[in-house]
Amino acid sequence: MVVTRIAPSPTGDPHVGTAYIALFNYAWARRNGGRFIVRIEDTDRARYVPGAEERILAALKWLGLSYDEGPDVGGPHGPYRQSERLPLYQKYAEELLKRGWAYRAFETPEELEQIRKEKGGYDGRARNIPPEEAEERARRGEPHVIRLKVPRPGTTEVKDELRGVVVYDNQEIPDVVLLKSDGYPTYHLANVVDDHLMGVTDVIRAEEWLVSTPIHVLLYRAFGWEAPRFYHMPLLRNPDKTKISKRKSHTSLDWYKAEGFLPEALRNYLCLMGFSMPDGREIFTLEEFIQAFTWERVSLGGPVFDLEKLRWMNGKYIREVLSLEEVAERVKPFLREAGLSWESEAYLRRAVELMRPRFDTLKEFPEKARYLFTEDYPVSEKAQRKLEEGLPLLKELYPRLRTQEEWTEAALEALLRGFAAEKGVKLGQVAQPLRAALTGSLETPGLFEILALLGKERALRRLERALA
């Protein structure tokens, strides 16, 4: 059975890169009828942010990436927080000492800094401490770390399923710390121990971890365990080809949710980061992605995460994928957040229908449609100028509108066209000032539709205010 996992660190906002890697882990597990695990790597206590774990899990659920095992759903391989598994890592670090694959190192932080200055990195000097002496010093409580003892000379072969075989000279592989002096493991030890104990068969992660993989391969060899298959995905890039980061891009999934991006659209867009459908389609469901997914269709070129392209895709989902009822339902929290209410479900649906071609995110709807829900809406400079130009015509139009009995789009269109013809002016010379009076904008859906939706009483009230 295929078992995949993601192991995010709760050190800040849920990252779009985490979602990208999670998506491919999820798809590969589902494609093969396997299991997808979420494990929280919270051993870096200095960078730990309270509440970050809950936000990561909430973001995965928002994106529709359900997992079979994890800290909040449990499972047969728990606990799923590394901070709750410390005795395990200590046990396996001791095992490596016994097997001759690790050693205790007692340098102080100051000594390590001096070694780095002189040698460019740790030089393995504690390898030469006799094991009996090291054990005695540890028993006395002398602070120390446990380091991997990389076999030298020699080479380590890493097979990456996307890139082929890479051979590393062991002289280039450092004796990394496996267990810190506070008893917490480093990423390398915890990662390998957990992947083995949780039965992970396929490790799908970002390409920045490729350089760590020879260390992990050596650890599997040291324990006598079979290594999983490794797939290192290309990193998401900014349009200028630099690695995506919060300095240049919006990387927080919470930001995308708050801005009114649809989880389906964001998920669809992330699928296209390094993957293409056999038929070249850009819009597809998660299920269609899973059915079409093969590693042969994953490209290693740096995929560009372009916010404008995502906005375009989000707009396509709003206009073409979701039903009118779904869009109306999803804009409600954004209307409430903007302090707006709606008189009926039918009114809201019609407002969304009229505005649908004009907004690309859910948050834009209350911004662009404010005049449909409140009398407190802004008036643009252009609209104000157009209103002032058209005041004489609007004063003559007002009594006609007030006595108009049939308040439908067709009847109102006939009235306005007839009025313009009677005055010998183009329809726009009447329609644009009226549009400005009713909405505060010149960029709106059709005027007749807006008149009908606002209703006679509200439309006349706004026109009276403009003429006052």
From Swiss-Prot:
It catalyses: tRNA(Glu) + L-glutamate + ATP = L-glutamyl-tRNA(Glu) + AMP + diphosphate. SUPFAM superfamilies: An anticodon-binding domain of class I aminoacyl-tRNA synthetases, Nucleotidylyl transferase. GO terms for biological process: glutamyl-tRNA aminoacylation. Signal peptide: none annotated. It holds the Pfam family tRNA-synt_1c. Keywords: Aminoacyl-tRNA synthetase, ATP-binding, Cytoplasm, Ligase, Nucleotide-binding, Protein biosynthesis. Its EC number is 6.1.1.17. InterPro entries: aa-tRNA-synth_I_cd-bd, aa-tRNA-synth_I_codon-bd_sub2, aa-tRNA-synth_I_CS, aa_tRNA-synth_I_cd-bd_sf, Glu-tRNA-ligase_bac/mito, Glu-tRNA-synth_I_codon-bd_sub1, Glu/Gln-tRNA-synth, Glu/Gln-tRNA-synth_Ib_cat-dom. It comes from the Bacteria. One of its GO terms (cellular component) is cytosol. GO terms for molecular function: ATP binding; glutamate-tRNA ligase activity; tRNA binding; zinc ion binding. The keyword Nucleotide-binding applies. A motif ('KMSKS' region) lies at residues 243-247. It is an enzyme of class 6 (ligase). A motif ('HIGH' region) lies at residues 8-18. ATP binds at residue 246. Catalyzes the attachment of glutamate to tRNA(Glu) in a two-step reaction: glutamate is first activated by ATP to form Glu-AMP and then transferred to the acceptor end of tRNA(Glu). HAMAP family: Glu_tRNA_synth_type1 (MF_00022). Monomer. This is Glutamate--tRNA ligase.
